[in-house]
């Protein structure tokens, strides 16, 4: 260090309790150059335990020496590794306790505006819209399943996380660079931060463990299908979601006591400034080392990352093996494999977008260093991770995409892509008072075909009724015209083309039926199967119904 320098002394204040703050720190400037010995002697002679000295060379704006007396009682950079969680600068030396931070020429304000004020807000709004659409589609009756309920819970957590990200990082980053939204920056943000910040941390933890739960559910369904009947049920999925939320709430409960709101009257102006500052708990070195660094790293990153990596490797191996034997897979097994492939993409995106935050937390925990630009990018990546699942569902989820088009583009699809359904049905007399009704349908849409076969057991009122209902020739069953097959008195056959459906999703049987409260076992042609009782409008019962749709 050179022999002469210009020294500037900045008096640091111990953070008081919430309330009106005392006058701002006082700056002392020495007009001429002083020697190192004079500087150190002046520093040691100053009273008060919270004094910091910044030594500036004459031709440099950056200090070459910083001396903090009794630094365990003051706020140091090392004690604030997570100020970015609140959108605050980790070193409050540059500002008063509360200060108007509007400065469009400051590089940090410009970067924060474009990364947080623009990108986080745009991505967040689109992500909220996508998650709402995902929740609507996944909650449809035809999408009712354990995995879809878990994905709905994941969308809920991601939506809350995006909202808190916008409130904490997106909107407050606009004012320091543009001068707009001062009312939010000064009168809203400081008062909601003590509650919104812990809610955001709860949502982040819940989102991570919902991703873990989804992967675990897919692992059981793909690798242990026999256990899936007991473990992967709709009721258990609700329990898994509640457990994840309760665990996240319990783990992040101390966050509610980490920050507080302070007020400061601007000297010479009729304005009261508000800002957020860390509480005494948040300034505790033990709390920071144990809870902020190690617990956060282990609970939010190490445990879920390692578990997700292992489970997805096992799922990928099973999917790869199944693809080699795809010809021998049943339709339900192919559907499970396709769903597992889609969720593999979800987890891969999760790894990619959370890798930088993981590196950043490791750097803070072990090296006590932090780059504010990287922190802002890290917050953006976490927001993107909570916003992209809808796109993955649209790209890889065939049924999800079909229902999405049906809900939001129903009229256009009906006009531009009419459906063509070929329907065939046959009814034979069993000779014991019942009819064996077999129907098949072929559904053509967008150049593809889908077939279904349905078997009914219809009571006719007595054996040998001469066809259907004891009549000969033509009869009517549920508004369906039956034609007697010549030479076969016990066989009635129907063949017709059904009118186009209003959308791409078709349910068979298409006639109006009401589902009774009970399920029964019915026997058709000596084949026993389990199904639902269906009741026609004329009170005739249909036995087992099995649909290939």
Curated annotation (Swiss-Prot):
Report where it is expressed, by tissue: Expressed in ovaries, heads and bodies. Expressed in dopaminergic neurons.
One matching Pfam family: 7tm_1
Membrane topology value: Multi-pass membrane protein
Q: Which GO terms describe its biological process?
A: adult locomotory behavior; behavioral defense response; flight behavior; G protein-coupled receptor signaling pathway; larval locomotory behavior; neuropeptide signaling pathway; positive regulation of cytosolic calcium ion concentration; positive regulation of synaptic transmission, dopaminergic
Q: What gene does this protein come from? A: FMRFaR
- Report the gene knockout effect: Deficits in simulated flight behavior with fewer or shorter duration of wing beats in tethered flies. Dopaminergic neuron-specific knockout leads to shorter flight duration. RNAi-mediated knockdown, either in adults or during pupal development, results in similar deficits in simulated flight behavior, whereas knockdown during larval development has no effect on flight behavior in the adult. Pan-neuronal or dopaminergic neuron-specific RNAi-mediated knockdown leads to significantly shorter flight bouts.
Q: Does the keyword Membrane apply?
A: yes
Does this UniProt record's set of keywords contain Signal? no
Q: What ranges are annotated Cytoplasmic (topological domains)? A: 139-158, 203-238, 311-341, 398-549
Top-level division of the source organism's lineage: Eukaryota
Please report which protein family the annotation says this sequence is part of. Belongs to the G-protein coupled receptor 1 family.
Keywords noted in UniProt: Cell membrane, G-protein coupled receptor, Glycoprotein, Membrane, Receptor, Transducer, Transmembrane, Transmembrane helix
This protein's name: FMRFamide receptor
């Amino acid at each position: 260090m050179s022999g002469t320098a210009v020294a500037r002394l900045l008096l640091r204040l111990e953070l008081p309790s919430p309330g009106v703050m005392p006058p701002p720190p006082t700056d002392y400037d020495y007009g001429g150059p002083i020697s190192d010995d004079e500087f150190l002697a002046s520093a040691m002679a100053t009273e008060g335990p919270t004094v910091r000295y910044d030594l500036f060379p004459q031709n440099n704006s950056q200090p070459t020496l910083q001396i903090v007396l009794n630094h365990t009682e003051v706020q140091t950079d090392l004690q604030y590794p997570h100020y970015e969680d609140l959108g605050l600068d980790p070193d409050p030396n540059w500002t008063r306790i509360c200060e108007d931070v509007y400065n469009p020429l400051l590089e940090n304000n410009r970067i924060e505006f474009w990364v947080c004020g623009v990108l986080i807000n745009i991505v967040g709004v689109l992500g909220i819209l996508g998650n709402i659409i995902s929740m609507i589609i996944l909650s449809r009756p035809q999408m009712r399943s354990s995995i879809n309920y878990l994905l709905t819970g994941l969308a809920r957590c991601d939506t809350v996380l995006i909202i808190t990200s916008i409130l904490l990082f997106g909107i407050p980053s606009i004012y320091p660079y543009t001068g707009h939204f001062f009312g939010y920056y000064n009168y809203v943000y400081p008062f909601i931060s003590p509650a919104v910040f812990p809610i955001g941390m709860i949502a982040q933890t819940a989102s991570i463990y919902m991703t873990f739960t989804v992967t675990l559910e897919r692992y059981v369904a793909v690798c242990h299908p026999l256990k899936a009947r007991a473990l992967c049920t709709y009721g258990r999925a609700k329990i898994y979601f509640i457990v994840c939320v309760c665990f996240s709430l319990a783990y992040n409960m101390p966050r509610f006591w980490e920050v507080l709101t302070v007020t400061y009257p601007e000297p010479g102006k009729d304005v009261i400034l508000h800002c957020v500052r860390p509480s005494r708990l948040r300034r505790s070195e033990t709390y920071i080392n144990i809870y902020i660094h190690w617990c956060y790293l282990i609970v939010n990153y190490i445990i879920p990352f390692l578990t997700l990596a292992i489970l997805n490797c096992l799922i990928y191996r099973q999917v790869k093996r199944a693809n080699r034997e795809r010809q021998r897979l049943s339709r339900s097994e192919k559907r499970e494999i396709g769903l597992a492939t889609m969720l593999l993409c979800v987890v891969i995106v999760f790894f990619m977008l959370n890798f930088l935050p993981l590196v950043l937390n490791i750097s803070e925990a072990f090296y006590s260093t932090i780059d504010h630009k990287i922190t802002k990018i890290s917050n953006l990546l976490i927001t993107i991770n909570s916003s992209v699942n809808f796109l993955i569902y649209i790209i890889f989820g065939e049924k999800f995409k079909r229902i999405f088009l049906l809900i939001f583009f129903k009229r256009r699809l009906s006009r531009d892509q009419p459906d063509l359904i070929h329907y065939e049905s046959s009814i034979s007399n069993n000779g014991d008072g019942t009819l064996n009704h077999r129907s098949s349908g072929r559904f053509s849409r967008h150049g593809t075909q889908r077939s279904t076969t349905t078997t009914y057991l219809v009571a006719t009122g007595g054996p040998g009724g001469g066809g259907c209902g004891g009549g000969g020739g033509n009869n009517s069953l549920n508004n369906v015209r039956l034609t007697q097959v010549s030479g076969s008195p016990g066989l009635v056959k129907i063949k017709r083309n059904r009118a186009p459906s209003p959308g791409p999703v078709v349910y068979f049987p298409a006639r109006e039926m009401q589902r009774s409260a009970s399920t029964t076992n019915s026997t058709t042609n000596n084949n026993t199967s389990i199904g639902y009782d269906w009741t026609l409008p004329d009170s005739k019962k249909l036995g087992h119904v099995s649909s290939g749709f």
